[in-house]
UniProtKB/Swiss-Prot annotation:
Pathway of action: Siderophore biosynthesis
Gene3D superfamilies cross-referenced by the UniProt entry: 1.10.510.40, 3.30.310.280, 6.10.250.3370
Pfam family, one: FhuF
Catalytic activity reported: 2 N-(3-carboxypropanoyl)-N-hydroxyputrescine + 2 ATP = putrebactin + 2 AMP + 2 diphosphate + 2 H(+); 2 N-(3-carboxypropanoyl)-N-hydroxyputrescine + ATP = pre-putrebactin + AMP + diphosphate + H(+); pre-putrebactin + ATP = putrebactin + AMP + diphosphate + H(+)
UniProt source species: Shewanella sp. (strain MR-7)
EC primary class: ligase
Organism superkingdom: Bacteria
Example GO molecular function: acid-amino acid ligase activity
Name used for this protein in its record: Putrebactin synthase
The protein's assembly and partners: Homodimer.
The protein's role, per its UniProt record: Ligase involved in the biosynthesis of the siderophore putrebactin. Catalyzes the ATP-dependent head-to-tail dimerization of N-hydroxy-N-succinyl-putrescine (HSP) to give pre-putrebactin and subsequent macrocyclization of pre-putrebactin to give putrebactin.
Length: 631
């Protein structure tokens, strides 16, 4: 282009390229904070608020019209009215059409604004003025994260279905399906987000420190000691770190080596543990030679340089989804022993192996005791959980060369074109949707039922805690993780060994089955069924029939547990509606007291059990005959 006496060279660019160019031109303004992404993020979160708060009876939208199986709702608030269309599914789940949502005030449609909706619902939420600002900050952070994903994650579901493990990890867009404020990450700044958020897929190095043994708890599986583990994990750096200590005049055998999250070192340890550093009880060693990628759980890392090496999980003192994400040194002292006990139980019962159910053991753990906080504070506190880490088995040694991995959370993933990864995975497998679901239930539900009925043992079976092993898209094995903090034995009839006493949980008998009905049915299957219904040939009714069939088949295989099947009836008419968002709204600093897990629970009446329709099937038999069409 000629401009008077000057000549300018112009290069056209596409809309997709604009965020990158904008970021380069304005490095202090996140490129994803653009109107179209922000509006889309708000529409997404408003949809989720309407869905989940209706499910938890916080709001009660009214049907004003019905047509072709679709309900048209209105929600009248003080200064505005929301309108939307949705299909009503089992477990009081509204599958809302995002494009149908609109809000009207004084006869004028207004932009959808998740923050505004939360404020309009403030009285119904019952949140204190002390906690509300932090919750609003978490909502904003969740919107920020969603806008980033909209701008940077456009991998089609069909591509993800064939992708490698870490591409899928970074490609997830939702987080926990129930919680509204599920990407709070209070403590991260803009640069931290790009460096440490799972969706950024950044490659990073861990900080390594030496911690004096008499201030630290180290525990490991039998036959594994600190030096053997760290030589395996650090390689030549182990010797380099020992030499560094010697050069400082320190005896290397007086210290353990500990990995630390880079953010945690910079923001917490270097300052809060300044006295320990000054006294030489904590010594900075340097960064890892190996490179890592953060996982969906945000404080766990997979080793990219050597994927066969351990996962590393570190304390991270950010507020995220109802907890400060620390790790307790007290818990670290017995975590490997708990893992060994659970693994021995699982491996001694052939049923688990037959179903393809495997434990990823936490093989070692370490925690530094800050004596001032431990002396000053008698109650549980995030200040006593700032400097701990653990090593967990990598999933890679558990798979064959042709097999792939993805967390079970991926089964709920929907891409920007509303295409479900689950549907793409079924297509890739070559199986019918019904056969795929049956195999999945055998891997996932059957072992969890067996743990519950045979051993009173429960896991935390949400999507991020389970890793599916796939062979050309076919589920063949399932890997359960996060054992030390999440496993419990409920009202167990047998005494537990002293080192695993922490697993014992006493609760009201009628609440025990909630670990299946809430954690699996309400928090996983409630979302899975509509995806199958909309994007595969398995209808919602057929899905729940397959679940019922799985339960009956399990019962038929274990008639000696008949008394327990009767006592904990999975086919009962209804179960208590446990409200996870209400729990977070009650205390978004610490949702659950691990010393008393039931204390902070919130309920809203009963919810109809989808399996109740199959109660009339003959005892402990398969429901297959009932479901077969008449000839």
């Amino acid at each position: 282009m000629n401009l008077a006496t000057n000549r300018a060279l112009l290069k056209p660019f596409t809309q997709a390229e604009f965020p990158t160019l904008e970021a380069a031109a304005h490095p202090h303004i996140p490129a994803h904070l653009m109107p179209e992404y922000w509006q889309a993020a708000n529409r997404h979160l408003v949809k989720k608020i309407l869905c989940e708060f209706t499910h938890e009876k916080i709001i009660t939208p009214q049907i004003y019209r019905q047509a072709a199986g679709i309900n048209h709702y209105e929600l009248r608030l003080k200064n505005c009215t929301y309108y939307f269309s949705a299909r009503h599914y089992q477990l009081d789940h509204l599958e809302i059409e995002a494009g149908s949502i609109r809000v009207s005030s004084a006869g004028q449609d207004k932009p959808l604004d998740a923050m505004s909706l939360i404020i309009q619902l403030k009285d119904a939420l019952g949140m204190s003025e002390t906690l509300l600002p932090t919750y609003l900050e978490e909502i904003t952070s969740t919107l920020y994260s969603k806008a980033y994903k909209l701008a940077h994650q456009a991998i089609p579901a069909a591509t993800l279905a064939k992708a490698d493990y870490q591409t899928i990890e970074a490609g997830m867009t939702e987080g926990h399906p129930v919680f509204i404020a599920n990407n709070g990450r209070i403590g991260f700044d803009m640069q931290d987000y790009y460096q440490f958020a799972p969706e950024s897929a950044s490659v990073l190095q861990l900080v390594w420190i030496a911690v004096r043994k008499d201030k630290t708890t180290f525990s490991s599986l039998e036959g594994l000691d600190h030096d053997s583990l760290l030589k395996q994990e650090l390689g030549e750096q182990f010797t380099e770190f020992q030499q560094h200590l010697s050069a400082l005049g320190q005896a290397a055998d007086s210290f353990y080596f500990m990995p630390v999250h880079p953010w945690q070192w910079r923001e917490k340890i270097a300052r809060t543990f300044a006295g320990e550093i000054a006294r030489g009880d904590i010594i900075y060693l340097g960064e890892s030679q190996d490179c890592y990628q953060v996982q969906q759980s945000i404080r766990t890392f997979l080793n990219l340089s050597a994927p066969q090496k351990c996962y590393v999980k570190t304390a991270l003192s950010i507020l995220n989804m109802g907890f400060m994400r620390g790790l307790s040194p007290l818990y670290m002292s017995c975590t490997p022993q708990i893992n060994a006990w659970v693994a021995d139980l699982i491996e001694s019962d052939s049923y688990f192996a037959e179903q393809g159910f495997v434990i990823l053991k936490e093989i070692a753990a370490i925690g530094y005791h800050h004596r001032y906080y431990e002396e000053a504070l008698t109650q549980d506190s995030a200040y006593k959980k700032m400097l701990s880490a653990l090593w967990r088995e990598s999933p890679l040694p558990h798979i064959e060369p042709q097999q792939t991995l993805m967390t079970m959370a991926a089964l709920l993933h929907v891409d920007h074109q509303e295409q479900a990864l689950l549907a793409a995975l079924i297509t890739h497998s070559g199986l019918s949707a019904k056969e795929w679901v049956k195999r999945y239930l055998n891997l996932y539900l059957s072992p969890l039922l067996h743990a519950f009925f045979a051993y009173d043992l429960v896991f935390m079976p949400h999507g991020e805690n389970l890793i599916l092993v796939l062979d050309a898209g076919v589920p063949v094995k399932i890997l359960m993780k996060d054992i030390g903090e999440e496993v419990a034995v409920l009202n167990g009839s047998e005494p537990l060994p002293q080192e695993v006493q922490r697993l014992a949980v006493e609760l009201e008998e009628e609440m025990k089955l909630n670990y299946i009905l809430l954690d699996i049915f309400d928090c996983i299957f409630r979302y899975l069924a509509p995806i199958l219904d909309k994007q595969t040939e398995v209808s919602e009714a057929q899905f729940w029939a397959l679940v019922a069939d799985n339960v009956r088949d399990y019962q038929a295989q274990h008639p000696h547990l008949a008394d327990k099947f009767a006592r904990y009836d999975l086919f009962k008419d209804s179960f208590v509606r446990t409200c996870l968002n209400r729990i977070q709204l009650n205390n978004n600093q610490q949702m659950i007291d691990l010393a008393d897990r039931e204390k902070n629970l919130r309920f809203a009446g009963e919810i109809v059990n989808p399996l109740a329709a199959f109660r009339q099937s003959h005892a402990f038999g398969s429901v297959n005959q009932k479901l077969k069409p008449k000839p």
